[in-house]
């Protein structure tokens, strides 16, 4: 290697598109790579949310025109190979022009052509799968990638190139104090249990409609913080209107500071997206997961099982959320000692150094 090659910063192209579940972990890794002196670029789709999220991040974006190929019409399926080929050549052109040294794919439609382009150019590829069930693109790329990162164990068949890293999470979440200390402090102060309900940015209609009636049946003192989405505030508030005196309820359209919300919660009730499960484990909070029933390959149930199987969480399928089932479940959980034990188990299965672990693997390629 020449002196000029040694002095040239490593150029890493990130590939992540479509959803925050792909983009946020990739962004955490990208920022850490930049801090270590790497040059970072991003392969994106023209209309994906990654363009908005990266607007102020000082990361140049290069777009290729690609869409999904699963479950679409006949004409689109027939055209798909040509679109993939065109997108692959576009990605190859960018990679050659930028002299990319390594490619890191975090999922989304863009990663398929991008990973293929890197392979054809002899550029090493790392992929990262956020869910417990591999997405279509990552499942295909795992065959050609040099390094395969999985957030949850056994997502991919065992191999020397498969590494369980966990999901990269924000620093604010990894900095949350230990669950034992938090729960014990609330217990000693005689505080009511804090129940946090999170439905995501749009809210989860099933949680908003079915949880209030069940929670109103409980007889212990509770502080309920229910994040329901901007469009469902009035309807959700109405369901709590006749709440008994033992309940204190706050209905919120969204939560600005999730780290604070996690740290103050004794129990969280939420969906089981990959990043949510990872943040719950990292924060150390007892959880009831209600997997999204329409999730591809039922991956949210698989995500939730990561914590449920070790006693850190309960799973309640949306189809079984009757008042009787919910009342029985919540009555069992209204015990801070039990919730403390669950929260401690959750923290024990967290991987707070996931971001640096993935960065180290990229640097070694």
UniProtKB/Swiss-Prot annotation:
Pathway: Cell wall biogenesis; peptidoglycan biosynthesis. SUPFAM superfamilies: UDP-Glycosyltransferase/glycogen phosphorylase. Its main location: membrane. GO terms for molecular function: UDP-N-acetyl-D-glucosamine:N-acetylmuramoyl-L-alanyl-D-glutamyl-meso-2,6-diaminopimelyl-D-alanyl-D-alanine-diphosphoundecaprenol 4-beta-N-acetylglucosaminlytransferase activity; undecaprenyldiphospho-muramoylpentapeptide beta-N-acetylglucosaminyltransferase activity. It is found in: Cell inner membrane. Its EC number is 2.4.1.227. The keyword Ligase does not apply. Keywords: Cell cycle, Cell division, Cell inner membrane, Cell membrane, Cell shape, Cell wall biogenesis/degradation, Glycosyltransferase, Membrane, Peptidoglycan synthesis, Transferase. It catalyses: di-trans,octa-cis-undecaprenyl diphospho-N-acetyl-alpha-D-muramoyl-L-alanyl-D-glutamyl-meso-2,6-diaminopimeloyl-D-alanyl-D-alanine + UDP-N-acetyl-alpha-D-glucosamine = di-trans,octa-cis-undecaprenyl diphospho-[N-acetyl-alpha-D-glucosaminyl-(1->4)]-N-acetyl-alpha-D-muramoyl-L-alanyl-D-glutamyl-meso-2,6-diaminopimeloyl-D-alanyl-D-alanine + UDP + H(+). GO terms for biological process: carbohydrate metabolic process; cell division; cell wall organization; lipid glycosylation; peptidoglycan biosynthetic process; regulation of cell shape. Disulfide bonds: none annotated. One of its GO terms (cellular component) is plasma membrane. UDP-N-acetyl-alpha-D-glucosamine binds at residues 19-21, 131, 170, 201, 255, 274-279, 300. It comes from the Bacteria. It is a peripheral membrane protein. NCBIfam families: murG. Belongs to the glycosyltransferase 28 family. MurG subfamily. HAMAP family: MurG. Cell wall formation. Catalyzes the transfer of a GlcNAc subunit on undecaprenyl-pyrophosphoryl-MurNAc-pentapeptide (lipid intermediate I) to form undecaprenyl-pyrophosphoryl-MurNAc-(pentapeptide)GlcNAc (lipid intermediate II). This is UDP-N-acetylglucosamine--N-acetylmuramyl-(pentapeptide) pyrophosphoryl-undecaprenol N-acetylglucosamine transferase. It comes from Acinetobacter baumannii (strain AB307-0294). The lineage of its organism: Bacteria, Pseudomonadati, Pseudomonadota, Gammaproteobacteria, Moraxellales. The gene is murG.
């Amino acid at each position: 290697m020449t002196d000029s090659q040694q002095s040239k910063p490593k150029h890493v192209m990130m590939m992540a598109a479509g959803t925050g579940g792909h983009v946020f972990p990739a962004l955490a890794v990208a920022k850490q790579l930049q801090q270590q002196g790497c040059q970072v670029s991003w392969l994106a789709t023209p209309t994906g949310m990654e363009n908005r999220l990266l607007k102020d991040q000082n990361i140049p974006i290069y777009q290729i025109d690609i869409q999904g190929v699963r479950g679409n019409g006949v004409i689109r399926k027939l055209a798909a190979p040509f679109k993939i080929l065109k997108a692959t050549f576009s990605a190859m052109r960018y990679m050659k022009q930028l002299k990319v040294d390594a490619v890191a794919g975090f999922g989304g439609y863009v990663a398929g052509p991008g990973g293929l382009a890197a392979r054809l150019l002899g550029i090493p590829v790392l992929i990262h799968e956020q869910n417990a069930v591999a997405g279509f693109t990552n499942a295909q790329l795992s065959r050609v990638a040099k390094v395969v990162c999985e957030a949850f164990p056994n997502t991919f068949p065992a191999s020397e190139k498969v590494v369980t890293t966990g999901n990269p999470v924000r620093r604010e979440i990894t900095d949350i104090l230990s669950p034992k200390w938090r729960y014990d402090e609330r217990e000693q102060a005689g505080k009511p249990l804090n129940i946090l309900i999170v439905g995501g940015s749009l809210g989860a209609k099933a949680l908003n409609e079915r949880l209030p009636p069940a929670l109103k049946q409980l007889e212990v003192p509770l502080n309920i913080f229910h994040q329901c989405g901007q469009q469902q505030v009035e309807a959700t508030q109405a369901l709590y209107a006749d709440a008994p005196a033992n309940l204190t309820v706050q209905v919120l359209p969204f939560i600005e500071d999730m780290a604070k919300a996690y740290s103050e919660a004794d129990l969280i009730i939420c969906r089981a997206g990959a990043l949510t499960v990872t943040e719950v484990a990292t924060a150390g909070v007892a959880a009831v997961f209600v997997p999204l029933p329409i999730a591809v390959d039922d991956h949210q149930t698989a995500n939730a099982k990561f914590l449920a199987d070790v006693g850190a969480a309960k799973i309640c399928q949306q189809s079984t959320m009757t008042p009787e089932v919910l009342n029985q479940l919540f009555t069992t959980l209204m015990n801070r000692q039990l919730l403390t034990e669950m929260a401690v188990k959750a923290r024990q299965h967290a991987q707070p150094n996931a971001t640096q672990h993935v960065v180290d693997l990229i640097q070694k390629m």
